[in-house]
Amino acid sequence: MSTTIIGFPRLGEFRELKFTTEKYFRKEISEEELLAAAKDLRAKHWNIVKEKGITEIPSNDFSHYDNFLDAAFLFNVVPASVQNLDLSDLERYFALGRGYQGEKGDVRALPMKKWFNTNYHYIVPKFEKDTQVKLAGHKIFDEFQEAKELGLNTRPVLVGPFTFLQLSDFEEGVKADDFVDSLVAAYQEVFAKLAELGATRIQLDEAALVKDLTAEEKALFLNLYNKLLADKKGLEVLLQTYFGDVRDVYADLVNLPVDAIGLDFVEGKKTLELVKGGFPADKTLYVGIVNGKNIWRNNYEKSLAVLEQIPAENIVLTSSCSLLHVPFTTANEEFEPALLNHFAFAVEKLDEIRDLDAIRNGQGSEALAANKELFATERVGENAELRARIAGLTDVDYTRLPAFAEREAIQEEAFKLPALPTTTIGSFPQTKEVRAKRLAYRKGELSQKEYDAFLAETIDEWIKWQEDIDFDVLVHGEFERNDMVEYFGQNLSGYLFSKNGWVQSYGMRGVKPPIIWGDVTRLNPITVKWSSYAQSRTNKPVKGMLTGPVTILNWSFPREDISIKDSTLQIALAIKDEVLDLEAAGVKIIQIDEAALREKLPLRRSDWYEDYLDWAIPAFRLVHSTVASDTQIHTHMCYSEFTDIIPAIDNMDADVISFEASRSNLEILDELKAKNFQTEVGPGVYDIHSPRVPNEGEIDNTIEAILAKVPSKKVWINPDCGLKTRGIPETKESLIRLVEAAKAAREKL
């Protein structure tokens, strides 16, 4: 057998790519310097993979921003507004992901969506009537050549044509079938050029095959691949899937003239069953056996038991998905060895793949023995009191009374807010000063008293500023928080925190998911101090800001020894205690963010309710079920596709929900109207993930579009997400325009 991985993290061991790219954005280094730094980083990563004994090394899994955006740029699926900018290729590329506002023009960023059921986000290209699909880029060739010059014959990786079409947007009057021939021709041109350069095999990532497929989608897939594989230009083709099984197309897949097929044996419920039913002897099977999404050590005995059942003759061991979704290495962590031994980040997963290959080939007995010993030892005990509390929950604990309509009237009288009330999602910019003070406090260089004084002063400034520009519902800004999950986890039992466990989320932004190690309980009040302080500084309502249980779970590395449902209920009870403490402290509007609710929704619709929504939605209701009727519960959701789960979202029984809508052209509003959505809504009126400031009239037009779909009495005006990562000048300018636009819209009601 041989070994490989689907892809490797790209930010770098210490997020070098992030920091270098941000210097470029700030014009502190040149384009040439950025490209040189990226080239050095790629070489370092390839060398790591090689030294770990992995026999097939991928290339083009690196990206300056997003691999899906790379494919759009490669195939010229770029809007005319960006094509026409008098900028370099790299500047136009970044304009697609971040937007551009400068002397050369003003364009918005392309939409951003969750990458399947992960916390990674991809940039969504749009096929327009005048889109001319053709080979227009050279990144895939450049990186293959770079590796070749280092003595490595890599396997280039590229988003497959079916997934590329499935996950892209289309202008009205345009459909995927219109681009099949031109896209196939462009892919074949890539094949030909790679073959010319000396490549022998290409990896086409077709993750969209693990979803429910209609007859039309299957027909599109087969049409694409029958045409594409008719002339492979001398290359071998690996069709790689991940995040689930390919039950809808397996029979067709194994009969295609591909040379290799990659399947997920970790998340693919039916993968083993499908393969045991037969796999062609003339194809190589890439077995995704090491989990690319979680950080726990692989149980070698369990993996070997799966491998023994696979009838395929030609096997390559690989990760279940790209290692992009886990941190770089445990080598820089400071956990006790007894803890650290249980974790495998990207570099350690290379060891696991190599170990499994060696054991299967009659070697690696020491590695197997050590692994057996690790899994034979009990890792963590149970919290009996917590388990009893969960066992005692009944239907009443998940139901808030009175019903929404009655609460809505009570809250209208209690708060007396104007029509189209204005608010923000929660966080304000975390400046260098804020981060420096937090670091100094952590290092003991700043006393508790000094740090508290700084936070109080900062909160005072922003409360006053919000009052000055006449926001209706204020926020305290979350200056004390490093991360919306880690901050809570630090006050919960059962959590561990890595020092350098960064994972890419979107663009150059990384998140550092905490690790759920054991049973979760609240250790002490978490947010009451600063939320109640902020409320004491104003007569206007200030929102208490919490992260919801489903998001805390989904943005953590979950346990594998108990179900995610049970872990979520534990977290829900901890957050419930916090909600009640906030309410008792006089905070009457409480936002419980469920930014990641959609994230772990199963990819197959048939699994949505039984496997997820039937416990995730009640877990949210459990958190707020016992608050008073005049306490208003808000929730917020980030970049996701919600249109297909609108009834479930309404069933969360929040009083107000805010969500991203600006980048996706308010598409969700039609569905809210169609489903008679009851919860009050705050569709984001401008995109905070781009540094551009909305133009004069831009927010006014967005509000007008919202009011055409949603009754004004149901509408709140807010940005589409928190403002932590933005700069102060752009934030203030944008929010002033938001308040002005809301007031102007009120005048027209």
UniProtKB/Swiss-Prot annotation:
Entries under HAMAP family matching the protein: Meth_synth
UniProt-listed InterPro entries: Cbl-indep_Met_Synth_N, Cobalamin-indep_Met_synthase, Met_Synth_C/arc, UROD/MetE-like_sf
Chain sites annotated for binding L-homocysteine: 425-427, 478, 593
GO biological process: methionine biosynthetic process; methylation
Protein keywords: Amino-acid biosynthesis, Metal-binding, Methionine biosynthesis, Methyltransferase, Repeat, Transferase, Zinc
Cofactor details (free text): Binds 1 zinc ion per subunit.
Highest rank taxon of the organism: Bacteria
Pathway: Amino-acid biosynthesis; L-methionine biosynthesis via de novo pathway; L-methionine from L-homocysteine (MetE route): step 1/1
Family: Belongs to the vitamin-B12 independent methionine synthase family.
Cofactor: Zn(2+)
Function: Catalyzes the transfer of a methyl group from 5-methyltetrahydrofolate to homocysteine resulting in methionine formation.
Record: residues binding Zn(2+): 636, 638, 660, 721
Active-site residues per Swiss-Prot or TrEMBL entry: 689 (proton donor)
Record protein name field: 5-methyltetrahydropteroyltriglutamate--homocysteine methyltransferase
Recorded catalytic activity of this chain's protein: 5-methyltetrahydropteroyltri-L-glutamate + L-homocysteine = tetrahydropteroyltri-L-glutamate + L-methionine
Residues that coordinate or bind L-methionine: 425-427, 478, 593
Organism name: Streptococcus pneumoniae serotype 19F (strain G54)
GO molecular function terms noted in the UniProt entry: 5-methyltetrahydropteroyltriglutamate-homocysteine S-methyltransferase activity; zinc ion binding
Binding-site positions, 5-methyltetrahydropteroyltri-L-glutamate: 15-18, 114, 555, 599
PANTHER family: 5-METHYLTETRAHYDROPTEROYLTRIGLUTAMATE--HOMOCYSTEINE METHYLTRANSFERASE (PTHR30519)
